[in-house]
Amino acid sequence: MFTPYGMSTLVKLAAVSVGTLLFSILLPLQAAIPVGSAAAIFLIFSLWFFRDPNRSLPPGKGIVIAPADGTVMSIKACSHPFTGNGSSIISIFMSPLNVHVNRIPVTGTVTLLQHHPGSFSMAFDEKSGEENERMEIGIESNGMKLHFTQVAGFLARRIVCPLSLNEPVTAGKRFGMIKFGSRVDIVIPAGWLPEVKRGAKTRAGETIIARLATTAGNG
């Protein structure tokens, strides 16, 4: 299936690809082959990029699920205004080949939602989390506060986030996407331990990226 968050873009890209394919028929064979091939490859990439596969939420309590497909870039200790001292930030880089639909990491209520305009530096640049265009999201769940940020990158210049303040959300629920490569930063509070390491691959809605310290080692 394809994500509704990118359907308008997908339709436009598909129209351009199909139009180019039809135009290539009118060209001499020597030119038609490369033009038609390029259009076909572009169409296949567009369909692949906006795919939205189903995911199976892992069982268990006291867990945080990856909000994005990608590769863990870094895990660092931090102090954050939403989650407090003793927090940890996990950064996930999403390449253009990853599924770009984002999913809610914990069940709870959205209590923070703030969009920041900014630049479009490479997503793997550490400064991009503070300087690039981004959407901050905070969820409160049974006294626990979790913060995560959709960060636009050099290619990803469109953040989609239809969430609303005070909206109840469920772990694994689709909540938006970042188009064409980007990153997601997740801040977990003190008392929660990262379950992934740098370089690990994540799948949104399936990979456990953090666990409550009292349950660590039980999953």
From Swiss-Prot:
Coiled coil: none
Main location: membrane
GO biological process, one term: phosphatidylethanolamine biosynthetic process
Short name of one Pfam family: PS_Dcarbxylase
Membrane found in the keyword field: yes
Cofactor-binding details, from the entry: Binds 1 pyruvoyl group covalently per subunit.
GO CC annotation terms, alphabetical: plasma membrane
Catalytic site positions: 182 (schiff-base intermediate with substrate)
Transmembrane segments: none
EC number: 4.1.1.65
Reactions this protein catalyses: a 1,2-diacyl-sn-glycero-3-phospho-L-serine + H(+) = a 1,2-diacyl-sn-glycero-3-phosphoethanolamine + CO2
GO molecular function terms attached to this record: phosphatidylserine decarboxylase activity
Pathway: Phospholipid metabolism; phosphatidylethanolamine biosynthesis; phosphatidylethanolamine from CDP-diacylglycerol: step 2/2
Membrane topology annotation: Peripheral membrane protein
Modified sites of kind Pyruvic acid (Ser): 182
Cofactor list: pyruvate
Residues with site note (Cleavage (non-hydrolytic)): 181-182
Localization annotation: Cell membrane
Family, similarity comment: Belongs to the phosphatidylserine decarboxylase family. PSD-A subfamily.
Role, per record: Catalyzes the formation of phosphatidylethanolamine (PtdEtn) from phosphatidylserine (PtdSer).
PANTHER family in the cross-refs: ARCHAETIDYLSERINE DECARBOXYLASE PROENZYME-RELATED (PTHR35809:SF1)
Subunit (UniProt): Heterodimer of a large membrane-associated beta subunit and a small pyruvoyl-containing alpha subunit.
Protein name: Phosphatidylserine decarboxylase proenzyme
Source organism: Chlorobium phaeovibrioides (strain DSM 265 / 1930) (Prosthecochloris vibrioformis (strain DSM 265))
Gene that encodes the chain: psd
